[in-house]
Amino acid sequence: MEEAYLALGKKILEEGHFKEDRTGTGTYSLFGYQMRFDLAKGFPLLTTKRVPFGLIKSELLWFLKGDTNIRYLLERNNHIWDEWAFERYVKSADYQGPDMTDFGHRVLQDPAFAEQYKEEHQKFCDAILNDAEFAEKYGELGNIYGAQWRHWETKDGSFIDQLANVIEMIKTNPDSRRLIVSAWNPEDVPSMALPPCHTMFQFYVNEGKLSCQLYQRSADVFLGVPFNIASYALLTHLIAHETGLEVGEFVHTLGDAHLYQNHVEQMQEQLSREVRSFPTLVLNPDKASVFDFDMEDIKVEGYDPHPTIKAPIAV
């Protein structure tokens, strides 16, 4: 099944259109692509490079809690959302440190600046962890995924828990074609640190199996997509566990599927590696609800990947 992902990387390298992008990095992209993963045949955590499952778990649990503040993530040594919160802070009047303009590019090109950035970033993370008032102001990312999944605000000021509603519908009306959760809220997009890349997902029940399809408007193929595949596969497993279903397929539909210019060599290296068997996901059988799970309740067994391939993140 990993071949589905590798085929996407190969296709972009061979056929991708060069495009400028919001980050100024430049990408090779395709529009409209779909991959399918049979979750009964193994948990789709890529093996052609190590994918940090602990980060995937803590991010998904963060979403499930409806949380949008990076403090929860930092407490679990998860730094994948740091840059977007840090960017908001260094653009504020409260920031008095060295100039951090365009830090995402400068840190790759200027070793002296990279040291400055590392120091300021560490100060920022320490402040988030140790100062609740600072964390409330600068750890917040706006109404991103968790808020939309669990607390979608309506025009009358009430809130919709989309995810809880969908889980209940899977139990009571599994043939419904409305088993949908959307993270794309046009009213909130301007105030989000990063508008949702994975925008909407839908569940489908057939012959006692739960399948999930994700529509992802923007797909960072080398860094982001391996996380997204594993995250939504895990979400499908968790909901199947609560609803008493087996797992079916994870269907991943991509809008703008892109490979950043500075990820080309890394993708080529990954494509040169031999695929290994997917691991097995193990969930704590004593936990009944999706919302009761914690880090120690979710494990993978038999994960034997090739080494990590590092690549810069585009902010």
Curated annotation (Swiss-Prot):
What is its subcellular localisation?
A: Cytoplasm
Q: Which GO terms describe its molecular function?
A: thymidylate synthase activity
Which UniProt keywords are given for this protein, alphabetically ordered? Cytoplasm, Methyltransferase, Nucleotide biosynthesis, Transferase
Question: Can you tell me which residues bind dUMP?
Answer: R22, R177, R178, R217, S218, A219, D220, N228, H258, L259, Y260
- Binding residues for (6R)-5,10-methylene-5,6,7,8-tetrahydrofolate, per the UniProt record? D220, A314
Instruction: List, alphabetically, the Pfam families matched.
Output: Thymidylat_synt
* Enzyme Commission identifier(s): 2.1.1.45
Kindly list the GO CC terms recorded for this protein. cytosol
Q: Name the catalysed reactions.
A: dUMP + (6R)-5,10-methylene-5,6,7,8-tetrahydrofolate = 7,8-dihydrofolate + dTMP
Q: Which NCBIfam families match?
A: PRK01827.1-2, thym_sym
Q: Describe the protein's quaternary organization and the partners it interacts with.
A: Homodimer.
Put simply, this protein is called Thymidylate synthase
Gene symbol of the encoding locus:
thyA
